């Protein structure tokens, strides 16, 4: 463990760029932390719950609000939610904001360096230019919890209407494919095989053709899949509400291994490849609601490393330049370094924790 800092309850995933890690809290704060100096560069009070992950593009940090979190996650959509653009070079000063009608759980993405795309619980997909102008919208038949994915020419996103949609950058619908179950995970794209991987609330992992949405194969787990797929060569990896982490062959969906944790796995895994001179296999890292971070061998599925937190983990790891960042509902942001030995089951109660609010 390189450091740990207390920020406040988080389910969003951290992002890192140029030695600065950014994350947001359910209590409505955004933090910019210097990775190596282990200190807060700046923090911004938004004043509304933030549950989707931030997007950093050029000098803009995009954040979105989820005001219904204040009362009840199942309450009706709040009528005042915002998409904010903050200037990272000016201590998070607001550049622009856009008001929309629905809560935002979906995390934004940038397409072809031109537009920001995001989904909302008001069933609408929004596309904005870099100045915050809405350039097109599209209404689906259900709330959108899924985050968009892009290959820079097309946009893919799932909806609670059990459909996954494909658009061009002008918002024209290319295709939609109805699957079995609500879609709340984020699509993952595999360029080499023109494949799209997505899991559903009915517990089915699908492989679709990116060009037309046709089903190549499907694999049934039996429990909701909220985790998004990580891809490594010819295998995919994802977590499931049945407490397991799965590895499937990307070409036909046959199972290679599965590993059971102590609770649901909503976190999306990340994988690291071994070096050519490394005798060890590559690693998969993922969090679980059982309050542990897991490190598994991607070839064997063997547990190589496990670290306890003080509450469940819904966020996904972020790995940049030998540093791994992951946040927890315990209010702590963890930074691990693979240049230091990762101690198994080391209690965080014995670690110095900086409180930053």
What are these regions, as identified by a protein language model?
Residues 1-11, 15-357:
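Extracytoplasmic/lumenal domain signature
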